[in-house]
Swiss-Prot record:
Keywords: Isopeptide bond, Nucleus, Phosphoprotein, Transcription, Transcription regulation, Ubl conjugation. Residues 386-395 have a biased composition (Low complexity). It comes from the Eukaryota. It holds the Pfam family Bromo_TP. It is found in: Nucleus. One of its GO terms (biological process) is regulation of RNA splicing. There is a cross-link at residue 271 (Glycyl lysine isopeptide (Lys-Gly) (interchain with G-Cter in SUMO2)). The keyword Cell cycle does not apply. This is STAGA complex 65 subunit gamma. Residues 87-108, 346-414 are annotated as: Disordered. Sumoylated. InterPro entries: BTP, Histone-fold, SUPT7L. Component of the STAGA transcription coactivator-HAT complex, at least composed of SUPT3H, SUPT7L, GCN5L2, TAF5L, TAF6L, TADA3L, TAD1L, TAF10, TAF12 and TAF9. The gene is SUPT7L.
Length: 414
């Protein structure tokens, strides 16, 4: 029996048994994977190096510790924001579910061994110039040959360096395509730098001179870096100073979080320190009997010890910083403290006054009176105008005409 055939129908072989249309369909339907168009990169045609390094790297410990501090500060800011939100809800009276207690302040990342103080360990200063001895084998070009890195190793190191730079700049995460693109940019920059350096060295060998002190200085100016000292400034400001700044920020954030978590402790620390105040008594200078006899006879002498030494003029319980004197050197330099015994003749108007004092002439002082400053005269503890020595009317300092009268009569020295 001949069956009617249609156009395009596949003939059935005699060896193939009759099967239904369901048997002809595939048993498992597979989804077609949709791929994004590949990003065009200069290094796309080269084999992609693995992420793991096949060579040991020596990262800068200062940079790595700065990155750890940045991550630590980010965690502290998140904890502070969470604690402040909980305190604000409690202040507003909003009923919230029982939340977990705030965790304790996380510890700061420890300093590396080469950044410890000098008394702990001798630090290895980064960028330390080694093998600078002209007599060394390294300086003469002798010793082990220089290790040559393959393209894959250089690519791995450059990839890791770019990731470190981004982390040091404050980025928390980055796409792999971004890292690959920035690695290509850094690769092209290094190629440009090395080509200019090769050209400058050949030009110096051909002409025998260079317009710059060194070919490296010339290439630095050509690529836009500037002087070689710019690298030192960058290291000082962007690496070392930035590390010190992050240490300070970490300390401030830790203290702030402790004040939020333990407000009672912060209140106790904020209490003012009470200082015990001791009463200050006036110091009187006793007048010797010989001085009283001289005053009674009409002759006055001003011994060196009348005003007293500095240790006698101030009580023992007062500190030197509380003294109104500027310093001991200024006290000793004043002509009043170095007077020798001066015998004075009484004035005609004061002959009858036994307690009156004579007047010192201008020839008594080797230096003019204008050279004395008010800082050289000790003031009273209660900021009064009277003398520091005594508040009585019989005080030599209070009524002596040395401080309130001009010279009227010429004296003679003993």
């Amino acid at each position: 029996m001949n069956l009617q055939r249609y156009w395009g129908e596949i003939p059935i072989s005699s060896s193939q048994t009759n099967r239904s249309s369901f048997d002809l369909l595939p048993r498992e339907f597979r989804l077609v994977e949709v791929h994004d168009p590949p990003l065009h990169q200069p290094s796309a045609n080269k084999p992609k190096p693995p992420t793991m390094l096949d060579i040991p790297s020596e990262p800068c410990s200062l940079t790595i510790h700065t990155i750890q501090l940045i991550q630590h500060n980010r965690r502290l800011r998140n904890l502070i924001a969470t604690a402040q939100a909980q305190n604000q809800q409690q202040t507003e009276g909003v009923k919230t579910e029982e939340s977990e207690p705030l965790p304790s302040c996380p510890g700061s990342p420890p300093l590396p061994d080469d950044l410890l103080p000098l008394d702990c360990k001798n630090p290895n200063a980064p960028f330390q110039i080694r093998h600078s001895d002209p007599e060394s084998d390294f300086y003469r070009g002798k010793g082990e040959p220089v290790t040559e890195l393959s393209w894959h190793s250089c690519r791995q190191l450059l990839y890791q360096a770019v990731a470190t730079i981004l982390a040091h700049a404050g980025f928390d995460c980055a796409n792999e395509s971004v890292l690959e693109t920035l690695t290509d940019v850094a690769h092209e920059y290094c190629l440009k730098f090395t080509k200019l350096l090769r050209f400058a060295v050949d030009r110096e060998a051909r002409l025998g001179q260079t317009p710059f002190p060194d070919v490296m200085e010339q290439v630095f100016h050509e690529v836009g870096i500037g002087s070689v000292l710019s690298l030192q400034k960058f290291w000082q400001h962007r690496i070392k100073d930035y590390h010190s700044y992050m240490l300070q920020i970490s300390k401030q954030l830790s203290e702030e979080y402790e004040r939020i978590v333990n407000p009672e402790k912060a209140t106790e620390d904020a209490k003012p320190v009470k200082i015990k105040e001791e009463p200050v008594s006036d110091i009187t200078f006793p007048v010797s009997e010989e001085l009283e006899a001289d005053l009674a006879s009409g002759d006055q002498s001003l011994p060196m010890g009348v005003l007293g030494a500095q240790s006698e003029r101030f009580p023992s319980n007062l500190e030197v910083e509380a003294s109104p004197q500027a310093s001991s050197a200024e006290v000793n330099a004043s002509p009043l403290w170095n007077l020798a015994h001066v015998k004075m003749e009484p004035q005609e108007s004061e002959e009858g006054n036994v307690s009156g004092h004579g007047v010192l002439g201008s020839d008594v002082f080797e230096e003019p009176m204008s050279g004395m400053s008010e800082a050289g005269i000790p003031q009273s503890p209660d900021d009064s105008d009277s003398s520091y020595g005594s508040h009585s009317t019989d005080s030599l300092m209070g009524s002596s005409p040395v401080f309130n009268q001009r010279c009227k009569k010429r004296m003679r020295k003993i």
